[in-house]
């Protein structure tokens, strides 16, 4: 059974939104991880870091995080025309804040510089990725 025009549009929008948001998020985060986060975390908790990183858990996080971002923020904004930056920043602050502030609270060698850097980065990265993914989707498939 062939898809209807509205069904095709739905899947095109969802696909472009997911792929563009994920690509932007992954590319920017990869750059930041290599240039800033890895040296920062190595300086403070190097003995705890896996080398090489475990790819499967990282992939699962990225796939689920982008899916959650689309579900909670980007898709509703696409459908309603609502702005996306503030809502996405809140999601980023909550997600990265949960990790960083909990780690700082319970781990002896967790440094405040790690908390601030990763918290701000996660907030900005999430907001920008959602905004850019939405802009690409609106520009290409409406």
Residue ranges and their predicted role:
Residues 1-11:
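Short, Lys/Arg-enriched N-terminal segments with co-localized hydrophobic residues
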Residues 10-142:
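Juxtamembrane/disordered regions of integral membrane proteins
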